[in-house]
From Swiss-Prot:
Similarity comment: family membership: Belongs to the CTP synthase family.
Pathway noted in the entry: Pyrimidine metabolism; CTP biosynthesis via de novo pathway; CTP from UDP: step 2/2
Protein name per its UniProtKB record: CTP synthase
Other comments on record: CTPSs have evolved a hybrid strategy for distinguishing between UTP and CTP. The overlapping regions of the product feedback inhibitory and substrate sites recognize a common feature in both compounds, the triphosphate moiety. To differentiate isosteric substrate and product pyrimidine rings, an additional pocket far from the expected kinase/ligase catalytic site, specifically recognizes the cytosine and ribose portions of the product inhibitor.
Gene field: pyrG
Organism of this sequence: Pectobacterium atrosepticum (strain SCRI 1043 / ATCC BAA-672) (Erwinia carotovora subsp. atroseptica)
Positions with a binding annotation for ATP: S15, L16, G17, K18, G19, I20, D72, K239, D240, I241
Residues the entry annotates as binding L-glutamine: G352, L380, G381, M382, Q383, E403, R470
């Protein structure tokens, strides 16, 4: 089987939406029966985004196999059925790290290590490895054409077009076509200059995606085609739109998928976008709306919670409800009190690291529990719910996590290596143990408790969800907490780690150690988010009565 490559680049300005455009095109090609995957090549020097600030980079998306990746991989999984893996995302830092490790081992036999050919060869090897077994591979190059950081990647894909053959490679370039109100027209010159920049590197784009706040007129598209040496039918207008889930249909209506299939000589049926039409219909025809408060520490940049925000919207689709998300800084709860939580139909506390704002999250969990407001805690959101319950219900005054107070009297949350077994002996788990070291990352099996609310929502006994955390519930204090009324609703494969807790005497109070947002999609939703939004709607109705 021959693999075909579509290389996606961006020009003029950043944040044009390369990831969404690539994912939307992939969705159309998948709907034509093709086996499609998407890769993201990031030009920054960090080895991966795992230790980058969420307020700079946005969220870290975790794949099934435990890779900490760019948030664009979340878009990819929400648009296509293919599961992403560590092969779908790599950075300049990762490439240089691998090449330097080989050099230290002597793999290059004393050769002088250079960007060309050693770095570019490593990039090409990664692309080919990531695309194995697929009909079409879309490869998104991060950054903007003209950035010095992107040059090795652009040179690598130029070489791939020569080596793989132009009949199996296609360059798709996103560019800005701004509208000038004073002139009353769109301007094509930035696009021409962006293409000129690409040509200077040796890349002739085959498809131009013209981003604008309005439809680019046919005469302007013809002008772009002529000056940029691109067929007129390959100049696609992609205007700003109120829903990203309308983009597959918008691209298909302009024949982009037909053009690509003909270019690659792929004989496949017409795309059936009925699933996406259903998503758009559900989004456009809600039966009501709910307001959900998300209490976090990175609210200045909503992209830090991108998958959570999207998953809440998916939960709304499944319940035909518009979800209005109110982002609340947990430090505001600390300084202004629970007044900032008024008029919410539900409260969600997402994951996070560090002590700043934790007490505000604990106050929020307390407010939700005492006022019967639907609550969903994710990762740290589960840990703060546990701390709150231990303090105020189980009689464990000052209960905390050793992440924040290492010597606290009641460490209800602790590092794996800090646990003691029932005999009082320290239980040590290192990298060779079945459940890894102090960081659990990636898909893990979870067994749901019979008769629990989550067992009812999932409709399955065993599930697999993705984790990214260092701290866990301390089993030594668990019995006292359970005796006070908290139910353990999910356990790890070896039955040693608490994965889900819930309150049986609360209308809807669920907290999980894993990140369910990473597996939610617009077409299928996710049981926890669908149930959470449904509970928010029910709470709203009770308040009206």
């Amino acid at each position: 089987m021959t693999t075909n490559y579509i290389f996606v680049t961006g020009g003029v300005v950043s944040s044009l939406g390369k990831g969404i455009a690539a994912a939307s095109l992939a969705a159309i090609l998948e709907a034509r029966g093709l086996n499609v995957t998407i890769m993201k090549l990031d030009p920054y020097i960090n080895v991966d985004p795992g230790t980058m600030s969420p307020t700079q980079h946005g969220e870290v998306f975790v794949t099934e196999d435990g890779a900490e990746t760019d948030l664009d991989l979340g878009h990819y999984e929400r648009f296509i059925r293919t599961k992403m893996s560590r092969r779908n995302n790599f950075t300049t830092g990762r490439i240089y790290s691998d090449v330097l490790r080989k050099e230290r081992r002597g793999d290059y036999l004393g050769a002088t290590i250079q960007v060309i050919p050693h770095i570019t060869n490593a990039i090409k090897e990664r692309i080919i490895e990531g695309g194995e077994g697929h009909d079409v591979v879309l490869v998104e190059i991060g950054g903007t054409v003209g950035d010095i950081e992107s040059l090795p990647f652009l040179e690598a894909i130029r070489q791939m077009a020569v080596q793989v053959g132009r009949e199996h490679t296609l360059f798709m370039h996103l560019t800005l076509v701004p509208y000038l109100a004073a002139a009353g027209e769109v301007k094509t010159k930035p696009t021409q200059h962006s293409v000129k920049e690409l040509l200077s590197i040796g890349i002739q784009p085959d498809v131009l995606i013209c981003r604008s706040d309005r439809t680019v007129p046919a005469n302007e598209r013809a002008k772009i085609a002529l000056f940029c040496n691109v067929p007129e039918k390959a100049v696609i207008s992609l205007k700003d739109i109120d829903s990203i889930y309308k983009i597959p249909a918008l691209l298909k209506s302009q024949g982009l998928d037909d053009y690509i299939c003909k270019r690659f000589s792929l004989n496949c049926p017409e795309a059936n976008l009925s699933e996406w039409e259903q998503v758009v219909y559900e989004e456009a025809n809600p039966g009501g709306e709910v307001t959900i408060g998300m209490v976090g520490k990175y609210v200045a940049l909503p992209d830090a919670y991108k998958s959570v925000i999207e998953a809440l919207k998916h939960g709304g689709l499944k319940n035909r409800l518009t979800v209005n998300i109110k982002l609340i800084d947990s430090q505001d709860v600390e300084t202004r009190g629970v007044e900032v939580l008024k008029d919410l139909d539900a409260i969600l506390i997402p994951g996070g690291f560090g002590y700043r704002g934790v007490e505000g999250k604990i106050m929020s969990a307390n407010y939700a529990r005492e006022n019967n407001i639907p609550y969903l805690g994710i990762c740290l959101g589960m840990q703060v719910a546990l701390m709150e319950f231990a303090r105020n219900v189980a009689g464990m005054e000052g209960a905390n996590s050793t992440e924040f107070v290492p010597d606290c009297k009641y460490p209800v949350v602790a590092l794996i290596t800090e646990w003691r077994d029932e005999n009082g002996d320290v239980e040590v788990r290192d990298e060779a143990s079945d459940l890894g070291g102090t960081m659990r990352v990636g898909g893990q099996q979870c067994h749901l408790t019979e008769g629990s609310l989550v067992r009812q929502m999932y409709g399955e006994q065993t599930i697999i969800e993705r984790h990214r955390h260092r701290y866990e519930v301390n089993n030594m204090l668990l019995k006292q907490i359970e005796a006070a009324g908290l139910r353990v609703a999910g356990l790890s494969a070896d039955r040693k780690l608490v994965e889900i807790v819930e309150l049986p005497d609360h209308p809807w109070f669920v907290a999980c150690q894993f990140h369910p947002e990473f597996t939610s999609t617009p077409r299928d939703g996710h049981p926890l988010f669908a149930g959470f939004v449904k509970a928010a709607g029910a709470y709203q109705k009770r308040q009206v009565k």
